[in-house]
């Protein structure tokens, strides 16, 4: 019996997948627990419509990520963070992902999740540093962060 999976079923199929399964398994387990439904013409067209909508949404998200990458990589887009510095030139504290995200929002109005900023170690020195930002699985931007004396 052909069924369309409504949920992921371990060892059988993923949501939206169309698969041939034994009739008893389909009727007694999958359909009863609303994990799948019989693959009728209406169900198949619904799955195709959902796939198209998901593909369109993914394309829009990718386009937004590319546009944001262009904004972040402009020459005038430099995130400036001021820190207190001691007499020897060492900074008090360090700049982390949250500080960079907060500065991006306050200086440029760009709301960016701190988890997308790929800063391995906190920045503890004065100067300019390039920090990668993963906007999408295919799009990574590099933002310039300038640490200066307050």
UniProtKB/Swiss-Prot annotation:
The record's section on Pfam families has:
Ribosomal_L9_C, Ribosomal_L9_N
Q: Which GO terms describe its cellular component?
A: ribonucleoprotein complex; ribosome
What are the recorded Gene Ontology BP terms?
A: translation
Is Ribosomal protein among this UniProt entry's keywords?
yes
First and last residue of the signal peptide:
none
Instruction: List the PROSITE patterns hit by this protein, alphabetically.
Output: RIBOSOMAL_L9
| Keyword terms of this UniProt record | Ribonucleoprotein, Ribosomal protein, RNA-binding, rRNA-binding
Q: Which GO terms describe its molecular function?
A: rRNA binding; structural constituent of ribosome
Record's keyword annotation contains Ribosomal protein? yes
Family, according to the entry, reads as follows: Belongs to the bacterial ribosomal protein bL9 family.
Q: What does this protein do?
A: Binds to the 23S rRNA.
Record protein name field: Large ribosomal subunit protein bL9
- Write the lineage as a comma-separated list: Bacteria, Bacillati, Bacillota, Bacilli, Lactobacillales
